[in-house]
């Protein structure tokens, strides 16, 4: 009985570790608006990692929904709002961004995720940088 229990426990831990590669990960993003004087550097968390998936050989005979593969995506998230410094009065200086609290492997939801294969490399500043100074949760 003890050996069976230990083997079950070991199997559960192994599967748990294999399935937990989709986790909240620290990410630095740069936010700027054309009208504002500064670029804001923000530290947040995003969902990143690997999900178990399989490629189906009989693609011609299956509906499109069966062909989608799981991606590492948000389970729970909140939005935070920051104020971009150096904006003129006629420009709204606020920017909201998601903060991942927990992640899951699932279908990519374009309502709140970028579902492209390779992102365009735009995470840089062209203006002087300011660190995240003012922010509040929405």
Curated annotation (Swiss-Prot):
GO terms for biological process: anatomical structure morphogenesis; cell-cell signaling; G protein-coupled receptor signaling pathway. The keyword Ion transport does not apply. The keyword Signal applies. Keywords: Congenital hypothyroidism, Disease variant, Disulfide bond, Glycoprotein, Hormone, Pharmaceutical, Secreted, Signal. It holds the Pfam family Cys_knot. Disulfide bonds join 22-72, 36-87, 39-125, 47-103, 51-105, 108-115. Indispensable for the control of thyroid structure and metabolism. This is Thyrotropin subunit beta. It comes from Homo sapiens (Human). The gene is TSHB.
């Amino acid at each position: 009985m003890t050996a069976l229990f230990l083997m079950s426990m070991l199997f559960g831990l192994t599967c748990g570790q294999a399935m937990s590669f989709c986790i909240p990960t620290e990410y630095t993003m740069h936010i700027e608006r054309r009208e504002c004087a500064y670029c804001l550097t923000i530290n947040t968390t995003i969902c990143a990692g690997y999900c178990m998936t399989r490629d189906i050989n009989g693609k011609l005979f299956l509906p499109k929904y069966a062909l989608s593969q799981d991606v590492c995506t948000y389970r729970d998230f909140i939005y935070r709002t920051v104020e971009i410094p150096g904006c003129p009065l006629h420009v709204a200086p606020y920017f909201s961004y998601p903060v991942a609290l927990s992640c899951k492997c699932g279908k990519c939801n374009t309502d709140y995720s970028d579902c492209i294969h390779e992102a365009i490399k735009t995470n840089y500043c062209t203006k002087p940088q300011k660190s995240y100074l003012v922010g509040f949760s929405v």
